From Swiss-Prot:
Superkingdom as given in the UniProt entry: Eukaryota
NCBIfam families: lepA (TIGR01393), small_GTP (TIGR00231)
Organism: Neosartorya fischeri (strain ATCC 1020 / DSM 3700 / CBS 544.65 / FGSC A1164 / JCM 1740 / NRRL 181 / WB 181)
Enzyme Commission numbers on file: 3.6.5.-
Name this polypeptide is given: Translation factor guf1, mitochondrial
Enzyme class: hydrolase
Single Gene Ontology MF annotation: mitochondrial ribosome binding
Domain tr-type G intervals: 66-250
Record keywords: GTP-binding, Hydrolase, Membrane, Mitochondrion, Mitochondrion inner membrane, Nucleotide-binding, Protein biosynthesis, Transit peptide
SUPFAM superfamilies (alphabetical): EF-G C-terminal domain-like, P-loop containing nucleoside triphosphate hydrolases, Translation proteins
Gene assigned in the entry: guf1
Amino acid sequence: MRGCLQLARWLSAAPKGTAASLTRAPFVLANAPRFFTSSASHAGSRSTATKPVSDLENRIAAIPIERYRNFCIVAHVDHGKSTLSDRLLELTGTIEPGSNKQVLDKLDVERERGITVKAQTCSMIYNHNGEDYLLHLVDTPGHVDFRAEVSRSYASCGGALLLVDASQGIQAQTVANFYLAFAQGLELIPVINKVDLPSAEPERALEQMKNSFELDTENAVMVSAKTGLNVEKLLPTVIEKIPAYGYFPVYLHKLFPLLTLTSPIGDCKKPLRMLLVDSWYDSYKGVICLVRIFDGEIRAGQQVVSFATGLKYYVGEVGIMYPNETPQSVLRAGQVGYIYFNPGMKRSKEAKIGDTFTRVGFEKAVEPLPGFEEPKSMVFVAAYPVDADHFEHLEDSINQLVLNDRSITVQKESSEALGAGFRLGFLGTLHCSVFEDRLRQEHGASIIITPPSVPVKIIWKDGKEEIITSPAKFPEDEELRSKVAEIQEPYVLATLTFPEEYLGKVIELCEANRGEQKSLEYFTATQVILKYELPLAQLVDDFFGKLKGSTKGYASLDYEESAWQTGNIVKLQLLVNKAPVDAVARIVHLSQVERLGRQWVTKFKEHVDRQLFEVVIQAAVGKKIIARETVKPYRKDVLAKLHASDVSRRRKLLEKQKEGRKRLRAVGNVVIEHKAFQAFLAK
């Protein structure tokens, strides 16, 4: 204020001022804008200027909490979840009708692959019987590798649309996602999609749902998400069937109906209780958090505290996804929206998924929410920058992506061959592949990725157990090996669905991959559900690709963790002139050693440049050589200037050359370029 008064006095006195005072004018005026800017930014971090309230915000404010509905769409891959989401957004006026295609699939990799990778949210307003309802839709992934996304989405929902393709019927991930939703107590509404296809058999699909899930199919809705047929019947069904309750599973409400009268999805009058559901990084705003408000309300300028870290933040902005970030003045109990802090979170690790936030001063009055179960990474790869100078850029890129996907584990490691890098853990091979694509597309990272491997459990003779995720930590020397009681590998229970005509080929494939059959049943006259217990190591070795090839693309696969079983596990290494190449080493079952060893030496030979001496490439387990290839040296013609008849001189020169090559091989280092590793490790 004092600066403003001084500026005003100077301006009023300026006409009478001397030339000297005029020369000072640029200094005062130049600093004035900087003063106002800094003051405004300082004030903005604590409070916000009053903004005109939009019509959308007025409509939301007028909707009581009893007319909130949170629901998601559950289905197998490619059964039409994202397309149905588009039609619902058009129906509610959230987006304009027209050429909308997977509006909620926002990542480039999702649009390229045609699958949903991240669960995306959107708020909608729908008028039913003359009353507005606030609907919160979650479009979930269908693939098993993104199960963590699905389970987090269910936590903020009261019900789900169980979507089945009328032409394909129930598939493996339909079954898996149904049981996941059922365990969470969600109210399930059967929906048959793609009824406009010539091959559609909606009655057969309904019969499958009734027999497999014991669902009441009388209220099932037959739709075509592509054409919009009957989509208008879905939202009234959602409003009438899905409850507006969030603290207790639906089955408890059914057992105790009085509970529903006293336990709505939240209370605006209570202190703030806010759950962090997801987070992502914005280059301008920093870390943005997707939150579910259970109690109270949150506004920009308020100070909140994290129960997990104890750190305090000022809220910079709140809003809803409609379908993009749409600022609001307040988020109330029962709503799902986004917030970001000003100043923002300094480290990505501060945004802990499942964390509870409340207003500063109310920590003792609020009970934190239980949060989410941490998923376990079961597929591991090593990632290295192609150029060692880009390590910091790769680290920043990985941290930003991990902010958006907390099921990934990150650990620094180094390799003599490839330098500094990271050991990354994923939920599956598709999860790994999508992460690699996002690193390249969104951050321009040039990386070398090793083939996927699975963890092993070492049980020592003294009773201790240790999980090994890196080949570098595997006990291979005789002294350590003598202290090991047994080595175990993880198994999974795989559920495969496919037409009956491919049964023989699928069983043959499973047996060839060390599988053990658990059950076989027909859920229709032509469709089979086959359950096999398989080693996870076999599953990540392109098992799904082989399954698709055996069934002409008609099979589907889902799996869940089973148990650890004892196996003959060894460390396979690649040796170049007897020196191990640490970046390539893998932990494998003994049955895979010979096949992999021969593949390695043959492929690696193609990418190693010839030297002045012989280069020997070997695959080895311990001291046993499994396979070998040799790169012949450049040949120098030492006999070029020699007379043809001088036999003794000829022999002497050849012996000297031979001895020289031996010395070179003994002391010479084989120079292997990064591009050779990149080509070797490429699929």
